[in-house]
């Protein structure tokens, strides 16, 4: 086991590294047969993600198979909700279901402050075990959902195509929505601090549905609360790198760069060179290979990785997909992605 700090952590902190570190969003999941076999045995997603033995085992599956530079906690962005008094389930093929969607002020005011050590001790246990297992051979990543995206789920009650319910709240009862978003910002910051204290070395905030907002509404309902989370976490953990990801972020990329995070994770609809040009140079970039490319050939994967790394040259860069890996992706192409990422400098030359 190496004594040097892991590659991804060094890169995230801005050190000169020999190659871009590589991991994949949703790298533990349905494209892996070993995961599907475990899912058949334990069909409840909440059991898989909240039983510490199962969560740890699933988190380690891609590490054991592919040795990525990052090992991310197997969990869900909705996992902290019950600790605030919001029950949920995740139905296979349907996605999240909120049992009692939040639609009035009384429900917002009844939400509890999040105390992760009491309501989610399994998260801390898994992160600690991951750190012990991978040592300095990989970086342990934690993650959360951002306030707007959590609010979208709990107000809509499920995934949505047009977000009409939460947008109605935003434009008819904005004070109520701001109260909900503020509660989530404070709770999510508490949750991130807990993850870092438990072993997470780098953390990512997913605002998956902020791309559904106009730039002006992003400035009103998403960015201030992303910024609040970052500020609260940085007060106590200033040296922990933070990554922000939004799906469909092309219209708000510059705005993302003003939230205080250290890295912007680009989706694949933004050319890496364009993304780098649009963001301040002090910010790192993550991404951004189209996950659909992993249905192609290993050669196509190599070519795209080479192109992505070339375009990010001169920046702090973490190689990743532009979205989570898709179910049904050939497992051997997941392996090809990691192999091509680790050998990219042999093909394009020079240090990053």
Curated annotation (Swiss-Prot):
The keyword Transferase does not apply. SUPFAM superfamilies: UROD/MetE-like (SSF51726). Signal peptide: none annotated. It catalyses: uroporphyrinogen III + 4 H(+) = coproporphyrinogen III + 4 CO2. The record marks 76 as: Transition state stabilizer. Its EC number is 4.1.1.37. Pfam families: URO-D. Keywords: Cytoplasm, Decarboxylase, Lyase, Porphyrin biosynthesis. Its main location: cytoplasm. This is Uroporphyrinogen decarboxylase. The lineage of its organism: Bacteria, Bacillati, Cyanobacteriota, Cyanophyceae, Synechococcales. The gene is hemE.
